[in-house]
Amino acid sequence: IEVAVLSSAMLLAGCEQVAILALNQVETTSFTVEGATLFMEGEINSKTLKQFEAVIAQNPGITTLVELEVPGSLDDDTMIPLAYRVRELGLTTHLTSTSRIYSGGVDLFLAGVNRTMENGAEIGVHSWSDGSREAKNYPRDALEHEQNRKYVEDMLGDDAFYWFTIYAAPADDIHIMSQDEINTYGLLTK
């Protein structure tokens, strides 16, 4: 029975990896422009940065990125350069009263030079996992933390929010942040 359970778990993990690879082959993010505002919805994947750059090239007057429903990122190797590009462009990030952002969507929100949200918006965070270990299971000075830790530090001025997220909920769950937590970690500039 133990072998069957282990085999099933490995197969399921393999299926998850295949699903992620498949989702990285199609556009999972949509962008809509209204004046100087760019509305974004969907999962961030390997196609998102290229989509974003195309929209910006056609609409150089964009000043604000509004995240609507952004459940996360399938590809941190895309999300982090996308976020640095948002910061480089000096964009404001904004959440409407119906915005729901989680995981990598929250990381992208941090890129705004100004970060604002309306009452009712939802911000959800959790740990990352490399498939075998959760972030909190690595020593604090482990190299595995560095890319995400440094990114948060670059965006917020310190890495306290990074450490909060990896303990807030395991990778397969989500913690919806309270207004006090949002304020404590400086997610909003206004």
Protein language model features and the residues they cover:
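C-terminal motif of bacterial Sec signal peptides marking the signal peptidase cleavage site
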Residues: L12-G14
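Charged, glycine-interspersed solvent-exposed loop segments at helix/strand-loop junctions
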Residues: T64, S132-K190
